[in-house]
A protein has these predicted regions:
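Intrinsically disordered, low-complexity, polar/charged repeat-rich segments
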Residues: 1-186
């Protein structure tokens, strides 16, 4: 894991039934970050690993909404909003990220299924591609990534789960597995 000079300061969720109605987006999940040591240029080509640590299957629901076609993204710098493409990438599905040994006869889908049942938390990871920082003025060290979601506002359990999210649910600089000893997984 590569440590970067960036910190997730605040996370907030709010429903806004009419703000993005023309885009069918009625809720916003906001991530407020702080950059240290004026290191924007260093961070532009980096990917920030994020682990979604929440109750039961809710991380999967968050991931599903992040990668939904109707979801929009913007960067907030001060009072300015800049629309950006989805800066998030899924982690754990690529063959190079496999944890279980595979042979040439094992189908990729079977490997993913086995890994999901052995290591379900492995699929609660995201990478935040920091390439959008090119829009950030050099003198700024704080910004927000806004995720504009389309949620069923009548689903009170879902809204409550989003409202209870906080910074502790999004762990930076973590990795799914550290293999300290060479041992065959069975």
């Amino acid at each position: 894991v590569r440590l970067l000079p960036i910190l997730l300061n605040q996370l907030s969720f709010k429903t806004n039934p009419s703000a993005h109605m023309h885009l069918n987006q009625n809720a916003t999940l906001s991530f407020k970050f702080e950059i240290f040591n004026q290191s924007i240029k260093q961070l532009i080509h980096e990917k920030l690993p994020i682990y979604l640590d929440a109750i039961s299957n809710f991380p999967l629901q968050v991931l599903d909404n992040v990668f939904n076609k109707s979801t929009g993204f913007s960067l907030k710098v001060g009072n300015d909003f800049i629309e950006i493409t989805n800066p998030f990438e899924v982690v754990g599905f690529d063959e190079t990220e496999s944890l279980l040994p595979i042979d040439q006869h094992t189908h990729q889908a079977y490997r993913l299924l086995m890994e999901y049942f052995c290591f379900p938390e492995k699929f609660n990871y995201l990478n935040l591609n920091l390439n959008f920082l090119k829009h950030l003025p050099i003198e700024k060290n704080e910004f927000e990534v806004l995720i504009h979601l389309k949620l069923n506002l009548n689903d009170q359990a879902c809204i409550q789960n989003y409202a209870e999210l906080n910074v502790a649910n999004f762990k930076l600089f973590s990795t799914p597995v550290v293999n300290l000893f060479n041992k065959q997984a069975e």
